[in-house]
C-alpha cells in the first residue's frame, strides 16, 4: 500500500517545549516559514508576508468567531459538571460534550452559575445521548423568546485547546481581528497572525481580501484512528461562501491573481464550494451548507493556489490536507526543519506559507 495511505506515515515527535502556550506580541511578530518551491524554504517573520505576495493576489479569510462555549456547573447533588457546546438544535436545545458523561444520566438537571455571581443560575436538563458526537442533548431553561446565544456571554468562557495548559493568553488573543460571526468552538488559527497594520500594508501593495465562514467544530480535533486513512470518516462542517466572495475569486482568476487560503478551514470552504459547483467544468456558485470533504495526498485541487497555515498535530487530518498540497515527504521534512530551528507549534504557534511554486506536481482538475 502507498505510504501516503498509512496513518503512521503522518506521525512525528514534537518536544513539549515546542507547543506554544502564548501568542506572539504583536501578532505579526510570529515566525513565518516560507515554502518557496519544491526545494527551498525561507525563514522570516509574519510581517514579511507581503514580500511573497503579488498585486492582484487574493487572501481568503474565515470570519468565524469563537463562542464562549465552555460552561462550568453542578448537578443537584453538588457534583461538578463541565460542558462544551457544539451545535444549536432549537432556541433552547443544544448538543454538548459533557464531563463526567457516565454520571450524567438522562433527566439529570444541571445548574450553571453566572460568571459575575450576580445573575440567576442557568438551568439545563439532559434529554438524550447524541451518538454522532458522544455528547448529550441539553434543554436550557430560558425566558420566553430568548435564545441561549443571548445569555451565553454571562455563563460561558472561551474554550482554549487542551494542549494550552497555563491560560496566560486573553480571550481576544484567541480571536482573529476580523472575527464576526459567532459559532466556532476553536479559532481558525492561521488568521491569528494578522494585524490591522499588516492588512493596510498588503492593501497598499494591491493584495485583496475576501471572506468565507466555517464554524470550527470539535471534529477538527478528533484524531484519525484508521491505519488506512481511506477508511476514515470525515466530520461534517457547515460552510458559507457568499456571492460577493465568489465574484472576487472569479475576478482574481481572470486577472491572473493567485488565491491563497488563510487556514485549512478556508481550504475546506473553497474546495468544498468548488466541488459542489462541479468547477471547473461548471461555473463557481455560492454555497451554504454542509461539507464532509476529506483532502489527502492524491487529491485533485480545483481552486486553491497557495496556503497560509500553522503547524499541525501528528496524525491529524489537517496534516494530510497540507500534504496533499506539497507531498507528505516534503511536509514531514519541513516539520523536522521547523522543530530543529525552534519554531512554535499549534494554535498560538508560528506560521508557514506555501507558495504556488511549491505546489508543482499537485495537479488541478482542468
Curated annotation (Swiss-Prot):
Domain of life: Bacteria
Keywords tagged on the record: Cytoplasm, Queuosine biosynthesis, S-adenosyl-L-methionine, Transferase
Role, per record: Transfers and isomerizes the ribose moiety from AdoMet to the 7-aminomethyl group of 7-deazaguanine (preQ1-tRNA) to give epoxyqueuosine (oQ-tRNA).
EC number: 2.4.99.17
Annotated localization: Cytoplasm
BP GO annotations: queuosine biosynthetic process; tRNA wobble guanine modification
Main location: cytoplasm
Pathway: tRNA modification; tRNA-queuosine biosynthesis
Record carries keyword Transferase: yes
GO MF term set: S-adenosylmethionine:tRNA ribosyltransferase-isomerase activity
Family affiliation: Belongs to the QueA family.
Family matches, as InterPro entries: QueA, QueA_dom1, QueA_dom2, QueA_sf
Quaternary structure, from the entry: Monomer.
One Pfam family matching this protein: Queuosine_synth
Swiss-Prot/TrEMBL catalytic activity: 7-aminomethyl-7-carbaguanosine(34) in tRNA + S-adenosyl-L-methionine = epoxyqueuosine(34) in tRNA + adenine + L-methionine + 2 H(+)
Organism annotation: Synechocystis sp. (strain ATCC 27184 / PCC 6803 / Kazusa)
A GO-annotated cellular component: cytoplasm
Name under which the protein is recorded: S-adenosylmethionine:tRNA ribosyltransferase-isomerase
